[in-house]
Amino acid sequence: MNLLEPSSGKISIDNLPLASIRNAWQKKISYIPQNFYILDDSFLENILFSEDKKQVEINKVNQILKFCHLDNLVDDLPEGLNTIVGPSGKLLSGGQAQRLAMARGLYQDRDILILDEATNALDKDTEDKILKNILDLKKSKTIIIISHNQKVLDLCDKVIEFKGNKANIN
């Protein structure tokens, strides 16, 4: 994930200019976007994505599969985690692909988790279960949720609404 330069002013974190700590800061963030890229590769490769393939933590992968309610799907796949999901994940439903993207972000296990409309392709029941799991993470991570879904926003401790050039904290 790249960080954009501000059009004016500067961004500081703990009184340090973001530009001077950009690489360290980026390593603290997992970003789960609304529009994600699925590799024409295995389920496992899509979870690992840019992570070190030599250091696969299979127990961690299995925990994340359960967290994202993908464990039963993977168990039913002909080659399990080694099943090729097809170009752009065409062998997966929209909700399954979105949960795979979520598993990728969670595998990175970073301090800050940003979810950008990350549950919009999920059915209500699956969304409720995954949101519960995500909220359990707030004990150990900073979670930033970007959503237009009021039900999702109602689960947040703080809501910042952007309208025009103003940010309102509710």
Label every PLM stretch briefly.
Residues 113-117:
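Catalytic Walker B motif of ABC-type/P-loop ATPase nucleotide-binding domains
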Residues 127-139, 151:
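Helical segment within the ABC ATPase nucleotide-binding domain
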